[in-house]
């Protein structure tokens, strides 16, 4: 999910179908740098609306300041608390480690993509393998 609508649809669906009354929906996401700035507020608002806990992190920030991107996303949260961890691997690790029985962790933005752009350099990235490593599977 790279758009406010995509985030809304996946989080709303997961909340309705999988999150039990005592479980929480944990969302890890970011927004790409040097792309549509106007969607960031709405992405934050979507996560604030449907997730219980949100981690805002990097997602191909390119040459844009990742903290600025996080701040623009954060504006969509209004008064609702959210967490910022600009290192994507650390954000995913923290979200997974904090999850309890019946919680669901949703990570949006990178999925099948095989690189993570930081500055002008494309670094190898495998989100699925990252999650498997954290879960030790």
What are these regions (language model features)?
Residues 1-137:
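ATP-dependent carboxylate-amine ligase
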